């Protein structure tokens, strides 16, 4: 049914040719789809095809589908005119006349304008703006003159001198223009020029002067009496009943309006119990108004609170990884949750602080990882990427793999003994000690330590050599001075020193023939006396080491170890960085 109606509307919109073709097509369609009956044998003979069969209805349906009349809903969009552009402003000027339309608060002779304009002017936008500024300045100048004139009159009245005895007429023309211009400049600077844009009421004398200046010769005095009656009628509201309203004498009842009470005895003097006005009574409900005010104020405060809460939740806080990437310098004490992400294999912009207690020693059968950090201690850094960085092979270092006889030294690629919690400590005092125990008691006699770990040699001196030998490295022989400083902590922080010192201190690693650590036969867990560390210096502040690493300075070497350094580093330069130690 909808399709038929749509075609009907389409036929109304089409021209004569299209409507005729559509009508012929619809008539032909009706003839072909007319049902065959026994009463019309001629039609049956005409409709039969060459094979004696009637035409199929599919042909008609195909013809109907192929016909797509244009829709009345899809019309070509009309070309809309461009945006409105103002190229000029026409100003019409009307002469003043006595209005009879407004009710001023005092006096008569209201101001109005004529029904037809007298002149008109055409301004451009810039000219009209300048004209407005000029008109406002002129209004402000006249107002300043009037203020000066009123001040002068007040001075004469205070002094007791009559205006006639002043010698000059007290008019606006008597005011000095130079003083007015000075006051005008100050007023414009203070922003009083915008005040001239608002309409200001004129006193009765000024209204009469404006009318006479506009050419009004006769001012109707009757308007003054009419305005006085209107003002009195507006002031006289409500009934004058005293407590009790008599419907026969109450002015509100006689006027057919309700009595009204805003506050006690105003405007109507009747009370609630004594009001007999048949039209009713209206009272001002202060409680209702106050309740409405409180509800409105509460609703506004709730809306403002919701908006402020939405503004606070909109900014997304940076993740620890983004904060570490944005910060140009590493924090002195990174949070526990970001210690895993702040440590790196070869990085000059990371800092890891690990506080270790040198007075604890554990048996070899102690678990290798006594305290593993939980999920809350993991940083946002992907552990797979960290493990890929840590699990470097000999081909990455450029060192050919050498197999030792007897299988004492395992494959350098086998770094299964490393754990992320051991390298990037979580602040556990026994983490490094447990790591050294697990390495000394494991089947793999030599684990691989990251050669690029930025470790400062001065951190060992902060806790003493004895604290390092006894607390950090189990089984090592210590000195009496180390017992006094076992409780101190040492910091693995940034420094200009490389990792030769820590590699020399650890038992399972060697940096060359001059740096090999010999074990005492019969006690594999105990170490002989250490060779003197080349870069040991008096303990200094970690910030000093960090600044030296930025400017590229190296840590000064003590004069006592200077001869040893020269001989050792000449041979150590030719030795590989990492050399397995046969057990």
Swiss-Prot record:
Widely expressed with highest levels in thymus and lung. Low levels detected in naive T-cells. Induction: By interleukin-2. Residues 1-79, 306-381 are annotated as: Disordered. This is Cysteine/serine-rich nuclear protein 1. One of its GO terms (biological process) is platelet-derived growth factor receptor signaling pathway. Belongs to the AXUD1 family. Residues 54-69 have a biased composition (Polar residues). It comes from Mus musculus. GO terms for cellular component: nucleus. It is found in: Nucleus. GO terms for molecular function: DNA-binding transcription activator activity, RNA polymerase II-specific; DNA-binding transcription factor activity; sequence-specific DNA binding. InterPro entries: CSRNP_N, Cys/Ser-rich_nuc_prot. It comes from the Eukaryota. Residues 18-41, 335-361 have a biased composition (Low complexity). Residues 364-373 have a biased composition (Pro residues). Its main location: nucleus. Keywords: Activator, Apoptosis, DNA-binding, Nucleus, Transcription, Transcription regulation. Disruption phenotype: Mice display no obvious defects in development, hematopoiesis or T-cell function. Deletion of Csrnp1, Csrnp2 and Csrnp3 together causes partial neonatal lethality, suggesting that they have redundant functions. Binds to the consensus sequence 5'-AGAGTG-3' and has transcriptional activator activity. May have a tumor-suppressor function. May play a role in apoptosis.
């Amino acid at each position: 049914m909808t399709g038929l109606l749509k075609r009907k509307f389409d036929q109304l919109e089409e021209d004569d040719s299209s409507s005729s073709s559509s009508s012929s097509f619809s008539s032909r369609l009706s003839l072909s789809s007319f049902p065959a009956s026994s009463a019309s044998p001629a039609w049956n003979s005409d409709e039969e095809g060459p094979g004696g069969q009637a035409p199929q209805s599919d042909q008609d349906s195909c013809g109907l589908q192929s016909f797509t009349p244009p829709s009345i809903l899809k019309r070509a969009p009309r070309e809309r005119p461009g945006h409105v552009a103002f190229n000029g402003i026409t100003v019409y000027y009307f002469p003043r006349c006595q209005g009879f339309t407004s009710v001023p608060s005092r006096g008569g002779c209201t101001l109005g304008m004529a029904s037809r304009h007298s002149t008109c002017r055409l301004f451009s936008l810039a000219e009209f703006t300048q004209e407005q500024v000029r008109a406002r300045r002129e209004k402000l100048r006249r107002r300043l003159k009037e203020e000066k004139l009123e001040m002068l009159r007040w001075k004469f009245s205070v002094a007791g001198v009559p205006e006639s005895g002043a010698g000059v007429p007290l008019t606006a023309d008597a005011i000095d223009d130079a003083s007015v211009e000075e006051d005008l400049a100050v007023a414009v600077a203070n922003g009083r020029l915008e005040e001239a844009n608002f309409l200001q009421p004129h006193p009765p004398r000024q209204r009469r002067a404006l009318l006479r200046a506009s050419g009004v010769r006769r001012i109707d005095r009757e308007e003054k009496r009419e305005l006085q009656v209107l003002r009195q009628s507006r002031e006289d509201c409500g009934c004058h009943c005293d407590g009790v309203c008599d419907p026969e004498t109450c002015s509100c009842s006689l006027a057919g309006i309700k009595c009204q009470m805003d506050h006690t005895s105003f405007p109507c003097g009747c009370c609630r119990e004594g009001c007999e006005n048949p039209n009713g009574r209206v009272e001002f409900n202060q409680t209702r108004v106050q309740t409405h005010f409180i509800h409105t104020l509460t609703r506004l405060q709730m809306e403002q609170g919701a908006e402020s809460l939405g503004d606070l939740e909109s900014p997304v806080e940076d993740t620890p990884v983004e904060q570490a990437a944005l910060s140009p310098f590493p924090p002195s004490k990174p949070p526990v949750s970001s210690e895993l992400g702040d440590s790196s294999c070869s990085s000059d912009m990371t800092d890891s602080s690990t506080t270790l207690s040198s007075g604890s020693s554990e048996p070899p059968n102690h678990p290798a990882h006594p305290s593993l950090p939980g999920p809350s201690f993991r940083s946002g850094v992907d552990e797979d990427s960290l493990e890929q960085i840590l699990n470097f092979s000999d081909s990455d270092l450029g060192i050919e793999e050498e197999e030792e006889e007897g299988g004492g030294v395992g494959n350098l690629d086998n770094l299964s003994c490393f754990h992320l919690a051991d390298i990037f400590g979580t602040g556990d005092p026994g983490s490094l000690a447990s790591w050294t125990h697990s390495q000394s008691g494991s089947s793999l006699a030599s684990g691989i330590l990251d050669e690029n770990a930025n470790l400062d040699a001065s951190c060992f001196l902060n806790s003493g050599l004895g604290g390092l030998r006894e607390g950090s490295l189990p089984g090592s022989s210590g000195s009496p001075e180390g017992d006094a400083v076992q409780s101190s902590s040492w910091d693995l922080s940034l420094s200009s020193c490389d990792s030769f010192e820590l590699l020399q201190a650890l038992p399972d690693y060697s940096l060359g023939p001059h740096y090999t650590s010999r074990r005492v036969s019969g006690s594999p867990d105990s170490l002989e006396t250490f060779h003197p560390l080349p870069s040991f210096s008096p303990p200094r502040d970690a910030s000093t080491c960090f600044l030296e690493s930025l400017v590229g300075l190296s840590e000064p070497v003590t004069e006592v170890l200077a001869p040893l350094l020269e001989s050792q580093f000449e041979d150590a330069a030719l030795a590989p960085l990492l050399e397995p130690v046969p057990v």
